[in-house]
């Protein structure tokens, strides 16, 4: 019975992430699935759609939720259609970046409260990862096993981060913006379900914090995920789990092209491997959260003998210890609920000061965005942006 269950779990895992990635087509299918899993995990753990909008899959022994079309949940069905449009642009090698944004005012989708940035890279011969070994005839040394382990590590990071962020407001909306490699994308191209859009005047509602969640390389693609969220949603996280260094970054950097410049001012989101030995026969035992570290990232420099940006030791430990993540529904569906430590009078005063600070931040960012856009018009060509024809 146990053997049959293990075989079933392995087959379900292979359905999500194939065991072998040796062709460009296999890599494309892998990246599509990784994007679907990432978006599904984020929306599930942030409680954006109801439970019925998700199916269940397994990555090794990690259970993940996959978004599906549900006629009783128009929002989830709409997001699935957006994903199909992303697949079209990805398959044509046009897609450069996806920004999935959360906003709270249905009449103002340009003022966002949280966003997730997915980036893809290509070469003229097709998509290829960043890390190339010069002494191997320009062929990547990344194996399928490395890619799969990096993928599971990324999903684990998403789980840990989403579980520990403060909850979103009860009523939120989603929007999506697609950016392209304009030099190869036809000027009249639009993915199914999308139309011409722009990112001018986009502002962040609050004080943003930036996190580099991670990236997954294949022999043909590089998939990268970054998160921008309200700083206050991180302030209540246990300091032993998440340790941010003070770093001020303007919101406009989310739209930058050059990763080596952009990454200098973002925070790394690293999982430290501080784990206890487990009983060999312990199945789904009670689990502890791994320590997280949010620190300023240095400019990446890849030496000739250097492996991809994931540590083999770190990945091996994390992949083999799946029970270190708590994926209980009570914690993941709505975020942690933090109790205020202030008395009523002080709490009311604190809320007023927070509102005043947010108002001043919004006014400041509106001014900054306007100045930056006007000053860059003569230097930078305006990039094409697509947005959904219908919002959730």
UniProtKB/Swiss-Prot annotation:
<dbReference type="GO" id="GO:0048477">
    <property type="term" value="P:oogenesis"/>
</dbReference>
<dbReference type="GO" id="GO:0007129">
    <property type="term" value="P:homologous chromosome pairing at meiosis"/>
</dbReference>
<dbReference type="GO" id="GO:0000794">
    <property type="term" value="C:condensed nuclear chromosome"/>
</dbReference>
<keyword id="KW-0963">Cytoplasm</keyword>
<protein>
    <recommendedName>
        <fullName>HORMA domain-containing protein 1</fullName>
    </recommendedName>
</protein>
<dbReference type="GO" id="GO:0007283">
    <property type="term" value="P:spermatogenesis"/>
</dbReference>
<dbReference type="GO" id="GO:0042138">
    <property type="term" value="P:meiotic DNA double-strand break formation"/>
</dbReference>
<dbReference type="GO" id="GO:0005694">
    <property type="term" value="C:chromosome"/>
</dbReference>
<dbReference type="InterPro" id="IPR003511">
    <property type="entry name" value="HORMA_dom"/>
</dbReference>
<keyword id="KW-0744">Spermatogenesis</keyword>
<keyword id="KW-0221">Differentiation</keyword>
<keyword id="KW-0597">Phosphoprotein</keyword>
<dbReference type="GO" id="GO:0007130">
    <property type="term" value="P:synaptonemal complex assembly"/>
</dbReference>
<dbReference type="GO" id="GO:0005737">
    <property type="term" value="C:cytoplasm"/>
</dbReference>
<comment type="function">
    <text>Plays a key role in meiotic progression. Regulates 3 different functions during meiosis: ensures that sufficient numbers of processed DNA double-strand breaks (DSBs) are available for successful homology search by increasing the steady-state numbers of single-stranded DSB ends. Promotes synaptonemal-complex formation independently of its role in homology search.</text>
</comment>
<dbReference type="InterPro" id="IPR051294">
    <property type="entry name" value="HORMA_MeioticProgression"/>
</dbReference>
<dbReference type="GO" id="GO:0060629">
    <property type="term" value="P:regulation of homologous chromosome segregation"/>
</dbReference>
<feature type="short sequence motif" description="Nuclear localization signal">
    <location>
        <begin position="381"/>
        <end position="384"/>
    </location>
</feature>
<dbReference type="GO" id="GO:0000795">
    <property type="term" value="C:synaptonemal complex"/>
</dbReference>
<feature type="modified residue" description="Phosphoserine">
    <location>
        <position position="375"/>
    </location>
</feature>
<feature type="domain" description="HORMA">
    <location>
        <begin position="25"/>
        <end position="227"/>
    </location>
</feature>
<keyword id="KW-0469">Meiosis</keyword>
<dbReference type="GO" id="GO:0051177">
    <property type="term" value="P:meiotic sister chromatid cohesion"/>
</dbReference>
<dbReference type="Pfam" id="PF02301">
    <property type="entry name" value="HORMA"/>
</dbReference>
<dbReference type="GO" id="GO:0005634">
    <property type="term" value="C:nucleus"/>
</dbReference>
<keyword id="KW-0158">Chromosome</keyword>
<comment type="subunit">
    <text>Interacts with HORMAD2. Interacts with IHO1.</text>
</comment>
<dbReference type="GO" id="GO:0001824">
    <property type="term" value="P:blastocyst development"/>
</dbReference>
<keyword id="KW-0896">Oogenesis</keyword>
<feature type="compositionally biased region" description="Polar residues">
    <location>
        <begin position="341"/>
        <end position="353"/>
    </location>
</feature>
<dbReference type="GO" id="GO:0051598">
    <property type="term" value="P:meiotic recombination checkpoint signaling"/>
</dbReference>
<dbReference type="InterPro" id="IPR036570">
    <property type="entry name" value="HORMA_dom_sf"/>
</dbReference>
<keyword id="KW-0539">Nucleus</keyword>
<feature type="region of interest" description="Disordered">
    <location>
        <begin position="323"/>
        <end position="359"/>
    </location>
</feature>
<dbReference type="GO" id="GO:0051321">
    <property type="term" value="P:meiotic cell cycle"/>
</dbReference>
């Amino acid at each position: 019975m146990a053997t049959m269950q293990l075989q079933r779990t392995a087959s379900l895992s292979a359905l999500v992430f194939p065991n072998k990635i040796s062709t460009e087509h296999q890599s494309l299918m892998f990246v599509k699935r990784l994007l679907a899993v990432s978006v599904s995990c984020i929306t599930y753990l942030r409680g954006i759609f109801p439970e019925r909008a998700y199916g269940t899959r397994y990555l090794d022994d990690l259970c993940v939720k996959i978004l599906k079309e549900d006629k009783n949940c128009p929002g989830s069905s709409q997001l699935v259609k957006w994903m199909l449009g992303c697949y079209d642009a990805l398959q044509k090698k046009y897609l450069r970046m996806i920004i999935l944004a959360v906003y709270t005012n249905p009449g103002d989708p340009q003022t966002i409260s949280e966003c997730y940035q997915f980036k893809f890279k290509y070469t003229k011969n097709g998509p290829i990862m960043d890390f190339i070994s010069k002494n191997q005839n320009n062929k990547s040394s990344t194996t399928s096993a490395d890619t799969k382990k990096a993928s599971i590590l990324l999903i684990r990071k998403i789980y840990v981060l989403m579980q520990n962020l403060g909850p979103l407001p009860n009523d939120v909306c989603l929007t999506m913006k697609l950016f392209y490699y304009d030099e190869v994308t036809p000027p009249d191209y639009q993915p199914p379900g999308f139309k011409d859009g722009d990112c001018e005047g986009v502002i962040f509602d609050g004080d943003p914090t930036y996190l580099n969640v991670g990236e997954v390389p294949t022999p043909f693609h590089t998939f990268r995920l970054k998160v921008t969220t309200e700083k206050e949603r991180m302030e209540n996280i246990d300091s032993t789990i998440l340790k941010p260094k003070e770093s001020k970054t303007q919101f406009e950097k989310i739209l930058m092209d050059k990763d080596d410049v952009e990454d200098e001012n973002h925070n790394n989101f690293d999982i430290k491997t501080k784990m206890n030995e487990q009983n060999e026969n312990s199945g789904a035992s009670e689990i502890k959260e791994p320590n997280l570290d949010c620190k300023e990232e240095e400019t990446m420099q890849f030496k000739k003998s250097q492996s991809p940006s994931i540590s083999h030791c770190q990945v091996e430990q994390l992949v083999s210890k799946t029970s270190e993540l708590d994926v209980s529904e009570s914690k993941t569906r709505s975020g942690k609920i933090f109790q205020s430590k202030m008395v009523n009078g002080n709490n009311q005063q604190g809320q007023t000061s927070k509102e005043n600070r947010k108002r001043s931040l919004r006014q400041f960012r509106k001014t900054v965005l306007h100045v930056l856009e006007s000053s860059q018009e003569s230097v930078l060509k305006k990039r094409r942006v697509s947005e959904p024809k219908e919002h959730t």
